[in-house]
């Protein structure tokens, strides 16, 4: 150091730094939700959820646009100004889950590693109302005592409350959940008694680029905010904190487009870098606004090559202004792009400028007054707003449309945490649940609707999605003392490998092969006796010829006789032996039932004995677990389909005892084509939620599902709908049958078949989500269940002779790789 008036080695750096307190206008918290500035302006901020624009109908988007314009008109006066921030920042996404099953643990770990390879992003909107009492009020403060000042402040706060109430009422329509559509930022106290301000937390982020809780200070706010050193260069700023350095560069509008429409800047919502977009708008008086339009029209009239249409447009704008269709105000825009590397930051700036210019705006990097653009992000910082322009409230509403993405619900669902975390094209995480519940409600333990419909053509990834969700469900086996039971009604064995990897039981019902079913070994309860009466009466029908009352009585007596025997003796053949043949009706009853008995009573074997005349009943859903039933063969056998279905569904009802329960139907149209399944599905759609259960239906044939006798229940009683890509989707099926909107239908058609994308719809909200398991070959082989994998699976079981997945999975993967390499 030079002791004679010299400069330190860091003097040059110090000259580039700013004492930021002078640039921060805030004095203190006046109330929990309101700040007051040194100039007596009042500041209040809300977080706005926004609308899921991807699938919103154009009419809805236009309606919301006009609502915003109407709101800005309603609150416009010289005392009111608005700051709106769109913040795109990195976020930590993930779900804490514990899986007992080794395959589920491995799948979840691989999947999360893939998700984490791409940084999750989130978009947040903040609306700040600035209320300026005006110079007259300031003058009064100077000439009156504290009591008068306090009275004036309370009056201003009440006026701000009135405006805020109108804002909240209007913006609650900008999200399906009305309570969380807009939430005011206030103060909260932690368990140690420390008070934190969410408003100051937002302002600190604008100053530092870091999101961290900020305590309510005892002293002035301006001296408390800003924990980073701010170094301003010619075109870039450095925000230096004790832990890292961040760089920032600004963009603003040099020229505006010829028109605006809602969502003009939506392309920026998909970018993979962090940024803060700031809009401010302060209305001017009608006289000043009209004078501005008249000057613009006069200037155009003096230009020889001016388009007459532009002059006419301004004339119409004058009329609209006078009629109150919009207001005009001073507007400013800035986009602060953040990054850790200056070179990457420049590339991100270039990308942002391209996106903006594609919409007709001329964007330019901010090089003059860079620090002014930085501090103008702070609400009520009037003096620093660069490149102000006059803009209508309708155009302002188009630039700030609060368009966002539906993010699902992470916590507080009926079964606790979200079922799964899915990626989206925007990078924003989507927390998927079968249940649909209010975003701001803690619904844990509530019995709510969770039925789900999955529609996807062959090859669209439907089987993989179903099996993946089945695996993700296994977290609830560990989380609940009552456990979880899933029953998968499968087709073409698509879920067999997966269910066996979960150490579940999988039953293939094939014509002529013993099923392992024996209904007569059910416990002798009133409910079971009634069921057996009904089932056996069906077996004894001949060509839809009903039993006589005498035959019903004979059959009922035999059933009750057999049920009093030890379980090992109860069989269909035993039942037949307990029917007397004193009358022709009784003999006819024996003849009909004989077809279902190993001993048909006439010295032969009944053709259908394999269905129910088995030594032991192997069907048991009483214990929590995963069960699969392949219906490929028996669903096409009209004679055995309904009796088998009746028994399966009766036993399944036993599992719906309050534990978490899910039944899944692949190619549901085929299952519900049977009357027993149709009746069950129709009834359970309405009542299963009361038993803490839900049903998941999938199909590649919408027409068959919509043509089912219970189609109305399957369509109307679904909380969640999933639509996989289908370029050949039939308009009538999707719009009239499934009640999709035109926008949703076009999304379903436009998604590439190999994109791994699908549309998830819950209530009025929808999102394009993605399940991309590329590179997870081992996991996909178990989830996909194709013919080649099934052959390798059967060979692996034969070689290991074990049901334990730990034994056969490794062999399965070896055989699969050998088959791919042409070694087998």
UniProtKB/Swiss-Prot annotation:
Any matching Pfam family:
CagE_TrbE_VirB
Gene3D superfamilies noted in UniProt: P-loop containing nucleotide triphosphate hydrolases
Q: In its keyword annotation, does this UniProt entry include Lipid biosynthesis?
A: no
Q: Where is ATP annotated to bind? A: 456-463
Q: Which GO terms describe its molecular function?
A: ATP binding
Chain ranges passing through the membrane: none
Q: Which UniProt keywords apply?
A: ATP-binding, Cell membrane, Membrane, Nucleotide-binding
Please state where this protein is localized.
Cell membrane
Look up the record and report any one GO term of the cellular component aspect: plasma membrane
Indicate the family of this protein: Belongs to the TrbE/VirB4 family.
| Protein name according to UniProt | Type IV secretion system protein PtlC homolog
Q: Which organism is it from?
A: Bordetella parapertussis (strain 12822 / ATCC BAA-587 / NCTC 13253)
- Its gene is ptlC
């Amino acid at each position: 150091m030079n002791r004679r008036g010299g400069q330190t080695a860091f003097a040059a750096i110090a000259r580039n730094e700013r004492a930021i307190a002078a640039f921060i206008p805030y004095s203190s918290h006046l109330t929990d939700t309101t700040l007051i500035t040194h100039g007596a302006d009042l500041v209040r901020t809300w977080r706005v959820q926004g609308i899921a624009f991807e699938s919103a109908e154009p009419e809805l988007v236009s309606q919301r646009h006009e609502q915003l314009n109407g709101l800005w008109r309603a609150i416009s006066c010289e005392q009111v100004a608005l700051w709106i921030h769109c913040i795109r920042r990195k976020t930590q996404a993930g779900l804490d889950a514990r899986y007992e099953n080794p395959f589920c643990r491995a799948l979840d770990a691989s999947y999360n590693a893939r998700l984490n390879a791409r940084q999750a992003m989130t978009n947040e909107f903040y609306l700040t109302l600035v209320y300026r009492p005006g110079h007259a009020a300031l003058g009064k403060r100077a000439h009156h005592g504290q009591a008068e000042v306090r009275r004036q402040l309370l009056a201003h706060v009440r006026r701000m409350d009135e405006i805020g109430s109108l804002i909240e009422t209007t913006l609650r329509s900008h999200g399906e959940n009305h309570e969380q559509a807009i939430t005011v930022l206030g103060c909260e106290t932690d368990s140690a008694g420390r008070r934190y301000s969410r408003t100051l937390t937002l302002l600190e982020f604008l100053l530092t680029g870091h999101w961290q809780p900020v305590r309510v200070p005892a002293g002035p706010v301006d001296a408390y905010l800003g924990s980073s050193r701010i170094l301003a260069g010619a075109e870039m700023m450095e925000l230096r904190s004790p832990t890292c350095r961040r760089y920032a560069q600004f963009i603003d509008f040099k020229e505006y487009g010829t028109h605006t429409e809602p969502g003009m800047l939506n392309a920026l919502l998909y970018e993979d870098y962090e940024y803060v977009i700031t809009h401010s708008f302060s209305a001017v008086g009608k006289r000043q606004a009209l004078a501005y339009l008249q000057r613009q029209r006069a200037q155009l009239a003096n230009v020889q090559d001016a388009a007459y249409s532009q002059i006419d447009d301004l004339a119409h704008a004058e009329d609209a202004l006078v009629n109150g269709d919009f207001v005009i105000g001073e507007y400013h825009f800035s986009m602060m792009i953040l990054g850790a590397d200056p070179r990457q930051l420049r590339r991100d700036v270039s990308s942002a400028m391209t996106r903006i210019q594609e919409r007709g705006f001329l964007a330019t990097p901010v090089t003059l007054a860079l620090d002014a653009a930085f501090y103008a992000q702070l609400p009520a910082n009037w003096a620093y707003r660069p490149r102000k322009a006059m803009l209508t409230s309708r155009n302002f509403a188009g630039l700030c449309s609060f368009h966002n993405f539906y993010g699902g619900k992470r916590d507080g669902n009926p079964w606790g945490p979200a079922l799964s975390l899915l990626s989206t094209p925007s990078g924003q995480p989507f927390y998927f649940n079968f249940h649909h519940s209010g975003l701001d409600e803690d619904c844990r333990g509530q019995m709510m609707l969770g039925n789900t419909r999955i529609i996807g053509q062959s090859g669209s990834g439907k089987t993989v999605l179903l099996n993946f969700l089945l695996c993700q469900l296994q977290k609830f086996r560990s989380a609940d003392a009552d456990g979880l039971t899933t029953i998968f009604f499968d087709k073409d064995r698509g879920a067999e490998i997966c269910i066996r990897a979960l150490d579940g039981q999988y039953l293939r019902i094939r014509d002529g092969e013993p099923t392992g079913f024996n209904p007569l070994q059910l416990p002798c309860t009133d409910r079971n006796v009634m069921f057996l009466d009904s089932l056996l009466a069906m077996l004894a029908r001949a060509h839809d010829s009903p039993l006589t009352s005498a035959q019903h009585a004979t059959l009922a007596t035999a059933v009750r006789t057999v049920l009093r025997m030890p379980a090992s003796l109860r069989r269909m053949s035993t039942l037949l032996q307990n029917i007397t043949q004193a009358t022709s009706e009784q003999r006819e009853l024996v003849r009909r039932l004989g077809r279902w008995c190993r001993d048909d009573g006439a010295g032969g074997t009944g053709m259908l004995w394999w269905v129910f005349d088995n030594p032991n009943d192997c069907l048991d859903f009483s214990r929590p677990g995963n069960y699969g039933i392949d219906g490929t063969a028996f669903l096409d056998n009209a004679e055995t389909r309904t009796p088998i279905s009746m028994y399966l569904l009766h036993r399944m009802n036993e599992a719906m005892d309050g534990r978490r329960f899910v039944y899944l139907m692949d190619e549901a149209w085929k299952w519900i084509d049977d009357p027993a399944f149709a009746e069950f599905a129709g009834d359970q759609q309405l009542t299963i939620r009361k038993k803490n259960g839900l049903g998941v239906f999938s199909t590649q044939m919408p027409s068959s599902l919509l043509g089912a006798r219970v189609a109305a229940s399957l369509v109307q009683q679904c909380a969640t709908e999933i639509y996989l890509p289908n370029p050949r989707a039939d308009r009538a099926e999707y719009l009239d049958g499934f009640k999709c909107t035109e926008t949703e239908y076009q999304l379903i058609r436009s998604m590439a078949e190999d994109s791994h994308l699908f549309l998830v719809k819950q209530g009025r909200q929808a999102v394009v989500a993605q399940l991309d398991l590329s590179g997870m070959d081992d996991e996909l082989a178990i989830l996909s269940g194709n013919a080649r994998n099934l052959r390798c699976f059967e060979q692996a079981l034969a070689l290991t002779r074990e049901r334990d997945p730990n034994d056969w999975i490794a062999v399965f993967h070896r055989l699969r790789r050998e088959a791919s390499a042409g070694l087998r």
